[in-house]
Amino acid sequence: MHRGPSLLLILCALASRVLGPASGLVTEGRAGLDIVHPVRVDAGGSFLSYELWPRVLRKRDVSTTQASSAFYQLQYQGRELLFNLTTNPYLMAPGFVSEIRRHSTLGHAHIQTSVPTCHLLGDVQDPELEGGFAAISACDGLRGVFQLSNEDYFIEPLDGVSAQPGHAQPHVVYKHQGSRKQAQQGDSRPSGTCGMQVPPDLEQQREHWEQQQQKRRQQRSVSKEKWVETLVVADSKMVEYHGQPQVESYVLTIMNMVAGLFHDPSIGNPIHISIVRLIILEDEEKDLKITHHAEETLKNFCRWQKNINIKGDDHPQHHDTAILLTRKDLCASMNQPCETLGLSHVSGLCHPQLSCSVSEDTGMPLAFTVAHELGHSFGIQHDGTGNDCESIGKRPFIMSPQLLYDRGIPLTWSRCSREYITRFLDRGWGLCLDDRPSKDVIALPSVLPGVLYDVNHQCRLQYGSHSAYCEDMDDVCHTLWCSVGTTCHSKLDAAVDGTSCGKNKWCLKGECVPEGFQPEAVDGGWSGWSAWSDCSRSCGVGVRSSERQCTQPVPKNRGKYCVGERKRSQLCNLPACPPDRPSFRHTQCSQFDGMLYKGKLHKWVPVPNDDNPCELHCRPSNSSNTEKLRDAVVDGTPCYQSRISRDICLNGICKNVGCDFVIDSGAEEDRCGVCRGDGSTCQTVSRTFKETEGQGYVDIGLIPAGAREILIEEVAEAANFLALRSEDPDKYFLNGGWTIQWNGDYRVAGTTFTYARKGNWENLTSPGPTSEPVWIQLLFQEKNPGVHYQYTIQRDSHDQVRPPEFSWHYGPWSKCTVTCGTGVQRQSLYCMERQAGVVAEEYCNTLNRPDERQRKCSEEPCPPRWWAGEWQPCSRSCGPEGLSRRAVFCIRSMGLDEQRALELSACEHLPRPLAETPCNRHVICPSTWGVGNWSQCSVTCGAGIRQRSVLCINNTDVPCDEAERPITETFCFLQPCQYPMYIVDTGASGSGSSSPELFNEVDFIPNQLAPRPSPASSPKPVSISNAIDEEELDPPGPVFVDDFYYDYNFINFHEDLSYGSFEEPHPDLVDNGGWTAPPHIRPTESPSDTPVPTAGALGAEAEDIQGSWSPSPLLSEASYSPPGLEQTSINPLANFLTEEDTPMGAPELGFPSLPWPPASVDDMMTPVGPGNPDELLVKEDEQSPPSTPWSDRNKLSTDGNPLGHTSPALPQSPIPTQPSPPSISPTQASPSPDVVEVSTGWNAAWDPVLEADLKPGHGELPSTVEVASPPLLPMATVPGIWGRDSPLEPGTPTFSSPELSSQHLKTLTMPGTLLLTVPTDLRSPGPSGQPQTPNLEGTQSPGLLPTPARETQTNSSKDPEVQPLQPSLEEDGDPADPLPARNASWQVGNWSQCSTTCGLGAIWRLVSCSSGNDEDCTLASRPQPARHCHLRPCAAWRTGNWSKCSRNCGGGSSTRDVQCVDTRDLRPLRPFHCQPGPTKPPNRQLCGTQPCLPWYTSSWRECSEACGGGEQQRLVTCPEPGLCEESLRPNNSRPCNTHPCTQWVVGPWGQCSAPCGGGVQRRLVRCVNTQTGLAEEDSDLCSHEAWPESSRPCATEDCELVEPPRCERDRLSFNFCETLRLLGRCQLPTIRAQCCRSCPPLSRGVPSRGHQRVARR
C-alpha cells in the first residue's frame, strides 16, 4: 500500500463535512454558533487574499502531481486559529465518471480527468489549545470538520450571505455534539434474510456460457488477484435523504468499507472491489421500477443494468457486477415493508443477467449488507445452510443468515464462505474478474469512515435527521445506541472504525485504541507444501492433493493476499475396482440413506447428469424425483457414467485425463488403444456369417477382449434379430431370453454398443474397447441373408500369426420341459475356435469334454386345481350309516413332483370333488346282543364276582356275531374288610377336621390345641414296675388342615405291612435271644366303624393330626426287636420354626412342633386302662405328630444342642435295628433315607450277628446285614463299650436283662439310625468269664429315658454324634385276654422312617414282651406294630401344552399353564409345595421370530357395478402362508363407481332459427336415471359426465341477395301497416310481405338474432 492514509484523513473528513448536512441545518438546533471570517495566508501568517480557493503552483520539471499547501487563518472566540492544509491527490483517480440522471436522461456527467485541488487534509493550530486534524473542502468557501481540544467543530459558509470582493466571507463554526438526553433502551430487530437461488434454466445458461469460456479456464487451484469492476447506483430516495452533494461521498465511503471487508484474510483469496461507474438517480428511471417488493426490484434492476452495461470487457466503464442502493424498505416476496435488507442471485457473478444485487440503506451497516449480497454473487451460501458453519449462539460472520453484530467482534468470513468462494473461482466461474481495470477508475477514500462520520452522523444515517447518539449506554466500539424520539434504539452493530471513543482515542476493529494508531499493512506469504493426502478412492482412478496456505505470514491490515498455485493434484490408485462393487457415485449417494427426505428414509441411487457432471444428483430407489445432494462430488469421481471417458471431477470441475493418466496431458490413444500410438500396430478383422438356416439363437462369431471400432450389421433386411451374450451362456447383454429390446445404447463388456433397427435392417456399433469376449448371435425368424462384422485389435509385437485355439463352450439353454411350474433346461456343448467360432467337435479334445448342464426352469405358475386323496375305509361294515372319506385340497403344481396347497377359494372356479361317499350300506348288519343288569357282588367286603345274562335280539334276519358277544361275569371290589381294634382315640376320622369349622388361612396358628379325649372315666391307676403313668386324654378339639387336603381312604392299607410281597416267616427262625415271634393277630374293626384317618399334609400351615390308625392285619416277626434292644423315637416339635431358627436351605414350611425335651417322661407313658397297670401305651396326643424330616432340624438333645448337627464321624458299620427318620444337613431340602436290602425275617439276620460277628477279636460289627421290614439304616459302630479290647462275646446276654440300670447304659446315635442302648459299666468279668450284667430291677426299662448328661460317661456335649432320643411306647390292653405273667408287659421300639418320602406311607416299630416270651403278655393288648404316615405331598410342576403363537412372524409369544400338582392324583397344590424341587418351568416363550413377508396384491378387477356404487376386488395373498402381518393385510375390496346411475339424454336437434345468415339449433338435454328411466330434477346428478351442448349455430352461410318483388302498395290498409311497423312487427316475413311499402327491407349490416348464442344450461 502507498504511504498516504495519514494525509488523506483530514481531506476526506473535510469532504465528508462539505457533503454533510443538508442546507438549512446550519442554524437549526445548534448551540453556541460563532461567526468567523477566514482569510488565506502564507506559511508565516501573512495575509494573501480574501479568496479562499487554494492556488497551486507547479514546477515545469515535475512530471507528477505534487500536493501543494494552503494556509488559512480565522479568529474564533478570541483565539487565532491557523489551518495548515495539503491537497489530497488520492481521493479520485483520473477518468472518474459521476453521472446524475434526471427523468431517465443524462442530466449531468462528470468525468474527472485531474485531481481537484480544493479537497484538503491537514491540521489546525492554536497557541494555547491542543490542535487536531482538519478535513476541509475549499471549493466553495470552507466546509469541513476540524478538531480542537479533542472536540469536533464544523465550519460552513453562513447561509444566505455570499462572498463580496474585497471582504472576507462570513462563516459559522459550531461544535459537533448530540443530545445528552437520558438514554433509554429500545427495541432492536435483527436484519432479515436475503439471497436468491438461481433458477434452473438460468443455471443451464451459465453452464453453457462457461463451456464457451473453456479456453480461458484455469486448470489448477491458483490464487490469483481478482478485480470486481463495480457499478454503483443510488436511487432517488438516497438523494432525497442524503442530499445530492452528499450522496456521492456517502456511497464512496460505504464502498470503501466493502472493499476492506473483501481484503480481510479470512476470505482466503485476493479480491479487489473497484468502482468504475457511479450513477445517482435524482428522479425515478422509466425502465427501473423500485418498489418494496425486493424480488421484483431485483428483476427490474438486473434487466436495466444489463441494458446500460457497455459491451466489451476492456472498456473502462464496463462493469462485472452492479449494486443498487436504495432507501426503500425492502421485503423479499411482498410489496410492503419488512425486515429484508438485500437480495441477490447465488453464483450470479460474471453472468450478464444475474450479476446484480439490491441493498437497503440503513446507515453505516450498509457496507455489511453490500458485502453479504456480493458474497452470494460469489456462490457463498448462508452459514448453516447446507454446511456446518452455523453461527447462532457463536461468533457471527458476514454470511450469517441475519446480520447480527456481536459486541466488540468484527465481522469476518467463515471457513465455509472461504471454501465456497474458492470453489467458485477454481471452477472458472469468475473469468470476468481476471482483467485488471483500466487506470481510469474511481479512487476510494482510505480514511477511516468514523473520521468522516461521527456517532451522531451515524445515528442520523440509521434513524433519521433527528436521531442522536445516546451516551453512557454502552461502549461505542461495541454497540451504537441512537435516540429515536424519547427512547434509545440499537441495531446491535458497533460504531464504524475511526469513531471517537475517548480523548485521543478511536474505535478500531471493536476496540478503543489510541487515535491515529493504524497497524502496519502486512502482505501474506505462502507456507510450504503439505504432504500428499490420502487417495480419494481405494480402487479405480482417485485423486490426491497437496496444499499450501497463505499463512507465512497471514495478510493483515489490508495487506496483499498471496498469489500463485495453492493446490496441486495427481492421480492415484489406478487398478480398477471389482465389477460387483457399487460405483463411486452410488457410494456417495448411499451416504444419505440415513437422512430423512420428506419425512421418510430412502435408498438413494445416482442419476447421470451430463450437463453438470461434477454435481451429485441422486434419486430415491422407489421414486423418479431427482435431487442435487451435493454441489460437487468427491475428487476422483468419473465425470460420466453413460460413456467411456477417463475424465474425472476435481474441485467440482470436470478435468480431462490423458491416456497416460496425467491430468490435462492431452495424451490420446490410436485406434487400437496404444497411448500416443500411430496406428502401426492395429489390425482389422472382418468376417461374414452366411448360414441361411437356423433355429433359435445361433452363434455367429466371437469379438475378443480389447476389440475396438466394432461394427455388426445385416447384409440385407430380414426379420431376424441380432443378440449379444457373454461367455457365460446365461448372461445376455442384448435381446436375450426371447425378448427384443428397443433401439438405444447398451452397456456391454465395459463399453457401449449402439443398437439400431431401421425397418428390418439391424446393426450394432461400438467404439470399444471390450473388457471381455462377446459372442454375436442371430435369433432366426427366417432365412439369413448374411451378417457382416468387423473389429480392430492390436497386432502382436512379433507380427506372427497365432495358432488356432480350440475349446469347449456351452451353448444357449434349451426350452423348459414344462409349460407351467418348474421344469428342466439343458445346455449343450460346442467346439469353438478363438476367432473362427463354432467348428466341428473333432477339433476339440474329447478327453476334457465337460458334462452337459442341467437346471431348473420356472415358467408361469400352474393354475390351481383340486387334488383328491385315496378313499379311507368305510366307517361302517354294514347298515345305512356307512361313509368313506378322502382328503380334498386345492393345490398348485410347482414341479414334476412338487405341489403346494392353496386356500380353497383359489379353486372356487372349478367343481370340487366329493370328500364323502356312502359305502357298505347294502350289507345287512347282524342282530345285536342284549344284556341284563349285573347281579350283587358275591361278597360283602373285599373282592368278589358279579354276573349278568346275555341274549341275542333277533332284530334283523342275520344272527348275532359270536365274536361280539359281551361278557357275563366280572370281578367286583367292595370296601376293605375291617377288623375290630380297641382304639383309644375315636375323635377324628378320615381326612380333614372333625370340627365343623375349617381354618384355611395359610399362616393360621391356633392359640391352644385341644387335648384328645380320655378312653374312660375311671380313676388314674398307680404306676408299678416299668409302667409309666399316662395322663387322661382331654376332649377332642378342632383340627386344622391345609386348603389342599388329601383323602387317602380309597387306598387299601389293610394289607400286611410286614410281609408285603415277601414269603411267610419260617417257624424255625424264631428261636433266638429268649423271645419268639408273636402269633398271628387278627385285628378288629374300629369301634366307631369309621375310615382310617390320614394325617395332614406335611409342610402345610395347620397342625398334623395323629388319629386312630387301623393296624395292619399281619405283623411278622420282623416287627419286633430283641428284648432289651430298644430304640428311642424322635419327639416331634410342636412350636413353629421362626425365621431365625430355620436352618439355611430349609424350606419355610410353617408346620408346628413341640419343644424338646419334654418336661417329664410321665407325659409320655400312661397305663392303658384300669385293672392292668403293667401295660404301657404311648400317649399319642395331638401335640405329637409323626416325626418329619424338617421337624428334626430344630430338635434339641438333652444338652440343648439341635439334633442333626454333624461331628467328626465315628467308624460306621450297619447293625440290625429299626430306622428313625434321618436328620437333615443344613443344605438338604428333602429327606434321603438310606436304602438297605430286606429279607423275609428279622431273626434270621440277627442271629448270625450275635453268634458270629459279635465275638472277641472282632473290632467292628458286620458291614452288611439283611433284615426284614422295616428297612435298616446304618448306625455307628460301638467300639470301646466294654473297653477298647473287650468286644462282645458269643452268649452275651441281651440288653433286655432287668439287672441293667440306667446308670450303666450308654446311648449312641447316628443321623438316620436307631438309638442303641448298651451297658456302660461291665468291665469286671463274671464267674463264667463273661462280663457281669448290672441289675436293673426296680429301674425303668432301658432305653425309655434319656441318659442324663451328669450320669453318663458319653453325652451329646462330648460327642455330638451320640444324642439320646426320647422313647415313644404304645400298648393296647384287652380285659378279655388271659392274665399275663406277673409284671410282663409289651415293650415297643422306635417308629421307623416313613416308607415313602412323600404322600401316604407306613411306619413300623418292634413290639416285644418284657419277659422275652410273647405268651406272657396279653396278645389282644399287643400295641400296633405299624401305622400310616403322611409326609409332604408328592408335588411336582405340571406343564400344559403351549398355546398357539400370538404372531406367526415378526416376533410373537406362546404361553402354557404351569401348575404345582400332586403326582398321585394330579390335584392342584399351592406353588410353595413345589418350591423345594426344580425351578418352575417357564410359562412363556418366544416364537414366530422370522421376519414378516410383504403381502402380495394383484391389480384391481373390474368394478361389479357400472354405477350406483359397486365393488372392486383383488387377490391379497401371503407368499408363505402365515408369514405376513395380519394387521397390515391390505384390503381386498374397495368401493367403485359411486356416482349415481344417471346420464345425459339429448333429443334431436330442432329446426334452425334462420335459413341463412347464421341461426341457432336447439335440442332437449335432460339428466335421466338409467335405472328408472325418469328425468332427474337435479341436473348436478349427471355432473360426472360432460354437459352436452343444447344449442349450436346453423345456417352460417350468407344469405343470397334476392331482389325483392316490386312493391306497388301495401296489401293491408295503410293505418294498420303503420301500426304494425310501430309495434316492430316488420321483421316478421309475413308482415313484411303484406306491408311492403310501410316496412322497408332489412339492412344487410344488422346482424340477425340467429348469431346470438344462447346459454348452455
Swiss-Prot record:
Location of the region described as Spacer in the Swiss-Prot/TrEMBL record: 683-794
UniProt domain TSP type-1: residue ranges: 523-578, 804-863, 864-923, 925-978, 1366-1414, 1417-1477, 1479-1522, 1524-1584
Major localization listed first in the record, in broad terms: secreted
Compositional bias per record (Polar residues), positions renumbered to this chain: 180-191, 1293-1304, 1327-1342
Residues annotated as domain PLAC: 1587-1627
Protein's cellular compartments: Secreted, Extracellular space, Extracellular matrix
Keywords linked to the UniProt accession: Cleavage on pair of basic residues, Disulfide bond, Extracellular matrix, Glycoprotein, Hydrolase, Metal-binding, Metalloprotease, Protease, Proteoglycan, Repeat, Secreted, Signal, Zinc, Zymogen
Cofactor annotation: Zn(2+)
GO biological process terms held by the UniProt record: cellular response to BMP stimulus; cellular response to interleukin-1; cellular response to tumor necrosis factor; chondrocyte differentiation; collagen fibril organization; negative regulation of chondrocyte differentiation; ossification; ossification involved in bone maturation
CDD domains found in the cross-reference section: ZnMc_ADAMTS_like (cd04273)
Region (Disordered) residue spans: 165-221, 1009-1034, 1073-1127, 1140-1237, 1283-1304, 1317-1384
Positions of the Peptidase M12B domain: 226-437
Stretches assigned to the Disintegrin domain: 447-522
PROSITE patterns membership: ADAM_MEPRO, PLAC, TSP1, ZINC_PROTEASE
UniProt biased composition (Pro residues): 1211-1224
EC nos: 3.4.24.-
Keyword check for Lipid metabolism: no
Chain positions carrying an annotated carbohydrate: N84, N622
Role played: Metalloprotease. Was previously shown to degrade COMP. However, a later study found no activity against COMP.
Entry domain remark: The spacer domain and the TSP type-1 domains are important for a tight interaction with the extracellular matrix.
PANTHER family for this protein: A DISINTEGRIN AND METALLOPROTEINASE WITH THROMBOSPONDIN MOTIFS 7 (PTHR13723:SF142), ADAMTS A DISINTEGRIN AND METALLOPROTEASE WITH THROMBOSPONDIN MOTIFS PROTEASE (PTHR13723)
Designated name of the protein: A disintegrin and metalloproteinase with thrombospondin motifs 7
Taxon lineage: Eukaryota, Metazoa, Chordata, Craniata, Vertebrata
Gene: Adamts7
